[in-house]
Each structure stands twice: as C-alpha cells, then as structure tokens.
Amino acid sequence: MTHSNRMLLGVNIDHVATLRQARGTRYPDPVKAALDAEEAGADGITVHLREDRRHIQERDVVLLKDVLQTRMNFEMGVTEEMMAFAEKIRPAHICLVPETRQELTTEGGLDVAGQEARIKAAVERLSRTGAEVSLFIDADERQIEASRRVGAPAIELHTGRYADAQTPTEVAEELKRIVDGVAFGVAQGLIVNAGHGLHYHNVEAVAAIKGINELNIGHALVAHALFVGFKAAVAEMKALIVAASR
C-alpha cells in the first residue's frame, strides 16, 4: 500500500452480512456493499471472518478478493484455521484481532506483550504471503513496543474507549491516549491506523490527529445507510474525514 499524507477510509462491511445472516438469506450482499463503498470513495474494504461465522462467510472473502478495485483488509483471530485461509486468499492487508465466541465485537486490543512468541510467529508466517500485517491493540506504549518487536509493520489503535466515554473529561482523556499512542507508534517506525466505535459525531477529533494513516469504520456506516443509502453514507463519512484531517 502507498501511504499518503491524506487520511484513508477503510469501510468495514461486516454488519451488512450480519443483516443477511439474521434470516439466512442471500441478501443484503456484502460484496455489493463493498463495490458501492469503493464508488463512494472508500480506500479499502475491511472484513472480519470470525471463528463463529456470525456475519462474513468464507465465500464473501473469496468473492471480494476477486472483485475489489481498492484492497482488502482481512481481520482474523490468531488461529491455525485462519492463518491457513489467509495463506490461500492472500489479502493485501491482514489485521490480527483478539476473538472470543462470547464477545459482541472485538472488545479491547490484542495482548501482544503477553504472547510475543505466538504473535511473532503469526506475523512472520502471514508476512510471507506478501500481506502488510497489522495488530489491533490498545493505545498503550507497552503494546506498541511489543508490536514493533514482533515485526508487524503496522498497528490499528483501538478507539472504543474514546467512543464509549461519557463525560467531556473522559472523552478528552481517551482522545489524549490516542494522540499519544499515534505519536509513539510513528516514532517507533510503525504505520498507525485506528478504529472501533467511530461514528459521524465523534470521528472528526480522531481524524484531526496527525500521523494516522487510515480509519476503519463499519457499524455506523451500515446503520446510517439504512436511511440514506450505502453510497451516501460512505461519501458523508469520507467528507468528514477529509475535512478534519486537512
């Protein structure tokens, strides 16, 4: 991937598949959503093939790999099954995320510092496919340093605590944590992305942070698309990010 000065938007289409799986139908099609997102200005498409297959299915990933004009960011747990699948699909980008069956979504970042040997082996193996491997972590210096040590070229900072913050003081504290994490990551020579819980009313403060390469956003886009359409939802988010990151 070429890393430009402008901030990129990665559109996560998982929850289009969530709606489909709720009834076991063939619609709505996440592949169509991905193509619409690209037309509306998405710089990449993110999908998370979960162990429990609650939304995205293998077939979606295979189809997307064939039709995307931008690039795929493939989110996956650190399991043998997923690593073998990623080796077969060979996405441009792979993001390793923590995963349990009970979670509603990816809660908290990957504990890289607590399992360095395991993560290092996964990063090395997946990097051999030609993918740029990133690690979904909290904006914590210990985890950022560990990410560099295991050889990951990129990290994605977890913005969920910022998104969930209730009071102005909490919001400011969590935003500062992200700002500091971005600066520390860049200083470590890492490509720094961010995402989780971002929506139309909280994205601008994060998009204004210098040093972030890409924001990954999904649930808010899919929710807004119910009322304005998918292309309009993506275009609106892209405009907010472009304006805030100038």
From Swiss-Prot:
UniProt KW keywords: Cytoplasm, Pyridoxine biosynthesis, Transferase
Subunit structure: Homooctamer; tetramer of dimers.
Pathway given in the UniProt record: Cofactor biosynthesis; pyridoxine 5'-phosphate biosynthesis; pyridoxine 5'-phosphate from D-erythrose 4-phosphate: step 5/5
Matching HAMAP family: PdxJ
GO biological process, one term: pyridoxine biosynthetic process
GO molecular function: pyridoxine 5'-phosphate synthase activity
Xref: InterPro entries: Aldolase_TIM, PyrdxlP_synth_PdxJ, Pyridoxine-5'_phos_synth
Role noted for this protein: Catalyzes the complicated ring closure reaction between the two acyclic compounds 1-deoxy-D-xylulose-5-phosphate (DXP) and 3-amino-2-oxopropyl phosphate (1-amino-acetone-3-phosphate or AAP) to form pyridoxine 5'-phosphate (PNP) and inorganic phosphate.
Full protein name: Pyridoxine 5'-phosphate synthase
Binding-site residues, 3-amino-2-oxopropyl phosphate: N12, R23, G197, G218, H219
The protein's enzyme class: transferase
Annotated GO CC locations: cytosol
Subcellular location as annotated: Cytoplasm
Positions of the record's site feature: Transition state stabilizer: E156
Catalysed conversion reaction: 3-amino-2-oxopropyl phosphate + 1-deoxy-D-xylulose 5-phosphate = pyridoxine 5'-phosphate + phosphate + 2 H2O + H(+)
Active site: H48 (proton acceptor), E75 (proton acceptor), H196 (proton donor)
Principal place of residence: cytoplasm
SUPFAM superfamilies (UniProt xref): Pyridoxine 5'-phosphate synthase
EC numbers for this chain: 2.6.99.2
Residues given in the record as 1-deoxy-D-xylulose 5-phosphate binding sites: D14, H15, R50, H55, T105
Family: Belongs to the PNP synthase family.
